[in-house]
Structure formats: C-alpha cells, structure tokens
Amino acid sequence: MAAAKDSHEDHDTSTENADESNHDPQFEPIVSLPEQEIKTLEEDEEELFKMRAKLFRFASENDLPEWKERGTGDVKLLKHKEKGTIRLLMRRDKTLKICANHYITPMMELKPNAGSDRAWVWNTHADFADECPKPELLAIRFLNAENAQKFKTKFEECRKEIEEREKKGPGKNDNAEKVAEKLEALSVREAREEAEEKSEEKQ
C-alpha cells in the first residue's frame, strides 16, 4: 500500500511538473504607444569636436562664492550647416541633461585654471543650460594635458573662424533678404509712378 501511495504521489508530481513546463504566459501591452522621434537640434549641425570632460560653474551668487560641479559627459563643438554659427554643447552622462550650451564668440578666451595643464576657464555672456540665457564663468577639466590641449586648439580654430566670418559682414541669407527688400521697394515705387502717370493723362 505504501508503495502504491508513493507511486501515486510521484504521478501527481510529474503531472504538476508537466503542467508547469507547458505553461507559457504571453503578456501583451494594454496600450501600444507609437515610437516618437526625438530631436536634439543637433541634426542640422556638424560635429567638429567631441571629448569626455567634467564641467564646473562659478557660483558667485552664494554667500561664499565657489566652484560647483555641473556634470561629467561629452563636450562638443557644433557648427550649424546653414548659419555657420558654432556652439559649445555638453550633456551629462545617463540623464543627457544639458550642462553647457552657448555660442562661440570672438571675445572668448580660454585661460588655465589655477595653473593646471588639463583645465581651462572662460566667460560666456549667454549660456542656455538652464533655458534662460545668463552670463557664466565656466571651467572644464579633461583626463590629461593632451586632451585639454586638443580642446583648446579646436576652440581657438572655431573662435577665429567666427571672427573672420564677422569681419566679412553679413552672410548669404542676410544679403538675399536685403536684395528682396530692395526689389520690393522698387516695385512699390514703380507702381506709384505708373499710377501718377495715368492720373496726369486723365487730367
């Protein structure tokens, strides 16, 4: 009897195992969401430089002004394909939150930070990291002196390019707009003169 009972229990157990092995639940999402295309505004820009670094800002608004870390990530120099403007953009790792976003201008100058050969300090009159533009004193630190020098070299190239571009005056788009304005003014003047001539003929 004991043997029969054991064999019955074994049979039940094997049946349960069979049921578990055959159980293959399929979970379907209740609501299917379409994929959203995420735009970073970098699609219209050419990447001139990219390197990992750590960024700081000088918190002068504090009672005791000090350097505060803004984040670690890739710093980029991006040139707009149509406008020709160049900006510095840096996002934090993982969160991708912007910690620096400003245009390169001819007046910007990189200076060594406390004599370090792998860090630079500079001023910007309008940093858009917090969406609202505001002046900032920023510092950036690289892994080594070689990387820091590569950044400085490319930064200076961009600064000089913007300086030369401003010396040449307005770009093609600006000139095209001015030509269109002149043509419009000319058309208005011609129409006015034609109306005056017709008025004189009637008299």
Swiss-Prot record:
InterPro entries listed in its UniProt record: PH-like_dom_sf (IPR011993), Ran_bind_dom (IPR000156), RanBP1-like (IPR045255), RanBP1_RanBD (IPR045256)
Gene Ontology MF term list: GTPase activator activity
Modified residues (Phosphothreonine): 13
Domain RanBD1 as annotated: residue spans: 26-164
Cysteine-cysteine disulfides: none
Transport keyword on record: no
Modified residues (N-acetylalanine): 2
Positions of modified residues (N6-succinyllysine): 150
Residues bearing PTM Phosphoserine: 21, 60, 187
Residues bearing the modification N6-acetyllysine: 150, 182
Pfam families, alphabetized: Ran_BP1 (PF00638)
Parts forming coiled coils: none
Residue ranges, compositional bias (Basic and acidic residues): 1-26, 163-192
Signal sequence, renumbered to the chain: none
Keywords: Acetylation, GTPase activation, Phosphoprotein
A cellular component term, taken from the record's GO annotations: cytosol
Residue numbers spanned by region Disordered: 1-33, 163-203
GO terms for biological process, alphabetical: nucleocytoplasmic transport; positive regulation of mitotic centrosome separation; spindle organization
Bias type Acidic residues, positions: 193-203
Quaternary assembly: Interacts with RAN (via C-terminus of GTP-bound form) but not with GDP-bound RAN. Identified in a complex composed of RAN, RANGAP1 and RANBP1. Identified in a complex that contains TNPO1, RAN and RANBP1. Identified in a complex that contains CSE1L, KPNA2, RAN and RANBP1. Identified in a complex with nucleotide-free RAN and RCC1.
Additional detail: Htf9a (RanBP1) and Htf9c are transcribed with opposite polarity from complementary DNA strands from a shared bidirectional TATA-less promoter.
Recorded family membership: Belongs to the RANBP1 family.
Purpose of the protein: Plays a role in RAN-dependent nucleocytoplasmic transport. Alleviates the TNPO1-dependent inhibition of RAN GTPase activity and mediates the dissociation of RAN from proteins involved in transport into the nucleus. Induces a conformation change in the complex formed by XPO1 and RAN that triggers the release of the nuclear export signal of cargo proteins. Promotes the disassembly of the complex formed by RAN and importin beta. Promotes dissociation of RAN from a complex with KPNA2 and CSE1L. Required for normal mitotic spindle assembly and normal progress through mitosis via its effect on RAN.
Record protein name field: Ran-specific GTPase-activating protein
Highest classification ranks of the organism: Eukaryota, Metazoa, Chordata, Craniata, Vertebrata
